[in-house]
């Protein structure tokens, strides 16, 4: 893993954690296992340093690599996110819940349809990423943007599931996802734009406030 690449990833994590995010997903699944494990450990350290004294410590999850997430668990990694090319979510969840993962180990699943969302709910996933909600070049393989109306439908269909909106989410439309019923949002480019850090901080604070209002309402 090139040092420059590692430094940029950790800098992006610092910015996101400073903005007040609850979760950071390590997406470099193509790294060799040892390098990915080391990156996850460093991410945990960054999160702890940047949120010192703050009870809302950002939690770290690893994309796809259940083996690395479990190996890094002792160092503070909190879970794994399973995409469409990952292990079967039901199999992974049953195996982890059989005493093979730490208590509280989160397992999230990417979903792109109502059927997939209900399947994840039946498997007792901790949360789902659902989308793409908006147009985005990074999600073209999953079809056209599905929009806020469909997002709201998904949230109503799986009321006991935390639904995280993904796909084209930015500073302008993030709040509308929460208003549609999502528990949170996931984004990449928004948190990589260091030129708008104050705006991002405001967006994250707004999402936290809206989420609190949704729960209390």
Where are these regions (language model features)?
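Conserved N-terminal beta1-alpha1 strand-loop-helix module at the mouth
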Residues: 1-88, 93-126, 146-149, 153-163, ...
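A short acidic, helix-capping loop that chelates divalent metal ions and anchors anionic groups
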Residues: 26, 134-140
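Flexible, Lys/Arg-rich cytosolic regulatory linkers and terminal tails that connect or flank
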Residues: 130-131
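C-terminal binding/interaction regions
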Residues: 185
């Amino acid at each position: 893993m090139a040092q420059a690449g590692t430094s940029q990833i950790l800098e992006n994590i610092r910015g996101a954690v400073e903005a007040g995010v609850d979760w950071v997903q390590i997406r470099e699944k193509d790294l060799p296992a040892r390098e990915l494990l080391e990156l996850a450990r460093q991410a945990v350290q960054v999160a702890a340093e940047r949120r010192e004294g703050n009870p809302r410590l950002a939690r770290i999850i690893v994309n796809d690599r259940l083996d690395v997430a479990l190996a890094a668990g002792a160092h503070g990694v909190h879970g794994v996110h399973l995409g469409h090319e990952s292990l079967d979510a039901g199999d992974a969840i049953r195996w982890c819940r059989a005493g093979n993962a730490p208590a509280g180990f989160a397992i999230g699943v990417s979903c792109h349809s109502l059927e997939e969302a209900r399947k994840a709910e039946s498997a007792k996933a901790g949360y789902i990423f659902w989308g793409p909600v908006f147009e985005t070049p990074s999600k073209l393989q999953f079809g056209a943007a599905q929009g806020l109306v469909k997002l709201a439908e998904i949230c109503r269909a799986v009321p006991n599931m935390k639904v995280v909106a993904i796909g084209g989410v930015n500073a302008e439309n993030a709040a509308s996802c929460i208003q549609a019923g999502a528990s949170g949002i996931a984004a990449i480019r928004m948190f990589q734009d260091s030129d708008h850090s104050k705006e991002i901080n405001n967006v994250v604070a707004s999402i936290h406030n809206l989420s609190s209002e949704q729960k209390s309402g």
